[in-house]
């Protein structure tokens, strides 16, 4: 165990430094706790909501910055899977004491970004993050996995059916636990399970137009979540 500080980029950090830093993260900081450590220390007021997720959450701030008005924090990390998010959930969500958390995760679990996994492992990680939030008085929004017919970084994979399956479970789990389900899939998906034309440049990550479609879904879900009591244990036993 070490309290060694996180690496800090110099003012002249170049692509070579960034590549080396990514290598350091892969070998020394699997959940990437360092990614938001400094930003978390600078949070002085209770956030309204923290967005936990992968690149789809991370890029939301980049491509739709107006959505992240005061009180909304983005803690997405590109490429991450649910086990990585679960490890950093205490530091990047619970410790900040937000009123609500928005969890959107599963694309990279399906892709196998951190190795072999299973549907049940993904479910358990979602359950664990939701339980941690509720136990700490944080309202929970579960965002559906956005549609995709293929992944450029996983040639040959056809994820559309799996995405629909996992979203079906998310919707049921949210209803069971009295959490809020944000159905981005319904707003973004074409009939074949791909992203609707014009909403993404790669079929996976929403572009500015895609996030514009997601915004009202998120706003409605957050408004609903902040009305739901969060104290106490889950209302029903796990399946």
Regions found by a protein language model. Give the residues of each.
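Charged helix-capping and loop-helix junction motifs
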Residues: 118-127, 160-166
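Short, flexible loop segments at the rims of nucleotide/cofactor-binding pockets, characterized by
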Residues: 25-30, 77-81, 159
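Catalytic His-Asp segment of secreted/periplasmic serine-dependent ester chemistry enzymes
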Residues: 146-239
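Surface-exposed amphipathic alpha-helices with a cationic face
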Residues: 130-134
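N-terminal secretory targeting modules
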Residues: 1-50, 62, 66-67, 96, ...
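A short helix->loop->beta-strand "cap" motif at the edges of active sites that frequently abuts
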Residues: 136-139
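Oxyanion-hole/transition-state-stabilizing segment in secreted/luminal serine hydrolases
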Residues: 52, 57-75, 82-123, 146-150
């Amino acid at each position: 165990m070490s309290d060694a500080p996180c690496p800090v980029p110099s003012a002249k950090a170049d692509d070579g430094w960034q590549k080396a830093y990514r290598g350091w993260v892969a070998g020394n900081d699997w959940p990437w706790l360092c990614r938001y450590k400094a930003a978390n220390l600078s949070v002085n007021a209770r956030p309204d909501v923290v967005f936990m997720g992968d690149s789809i959450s991370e890029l939301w701030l980049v491509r739709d910055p107006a959505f992240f008005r005061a009180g909304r924090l983005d803690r997405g990390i590109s490429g991450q899977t649910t086990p990585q998010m679960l490890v950093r959930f205490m530091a990047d969500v619970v410790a900040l004491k937000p009123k609500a958390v928005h969890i959107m995760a599963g694309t990279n679990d399906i892709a196998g970004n951190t190795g072999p996994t299973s549907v049940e492992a993904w479910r358990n990680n979602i359950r664990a993050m939701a339980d941690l939030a509720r136990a700490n008085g944080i309202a929970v929004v579960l965002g559906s996995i956005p549609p995709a017919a293929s992944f450029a970084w996983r040639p040959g994979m056809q994820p559309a059916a799996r995405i629909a399956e996992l979203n079906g479970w998310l919707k049921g789990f949210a209803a069971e636990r009295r959490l809020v389900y944000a159905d981005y899939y319904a707003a973004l998906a074409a009939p074949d399970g791909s992203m609707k034309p014009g909403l993404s440049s790669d079929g996976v990550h929403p572009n500015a137009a895609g996030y514009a479609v997601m915004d009202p879904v998120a706003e409605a879900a957050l408004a609903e979540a902040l009305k739901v009591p969060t104290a106490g244990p889950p209302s029903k036993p796990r399946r």
